[in-house]
């Protein structure tokens, strides 16, 4: 059996270069900044313009200690938030004392055909320097044939001084278009933080 070796490894061997490579550009749609806000809602800009949307949440700080940062969707431009979801959730953690680590599934933080808000991050610390960051990808929200998938990864400062790495995925179990997303804490306000909405072209 002969071995094929690829040695096309120099610029002189390239025959053509495309003028541009399309795909993957982030287009900022809107930005919202929390200031003791009970909720942050995006009720416009989520439509058929893009097949993928990304929410980036930056320096989210809760007013209340030990709470969960969460989200839900809407099919009526934000008049109500309670779309049925099925999700999965796992995370890894490591404490500052270097005495506790784990990687595991979080049974109590997933949803099974529920209209509740899905948490990104739990046991948020509300100390002056404690916060959380992450992103939520929402795919093809205006499609009226299939369910609407989403994935999220985030990190937050746990109220007991842990670094937490969170992974959430699932779908809105509806063929109706998702046209609004709301973020909130399980209790109390979002004291500070910024959420940006991007469309991916």
Where are these regions (language model features)?
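Surface-exposed molecular-recognition determinants
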Residues: 2-201
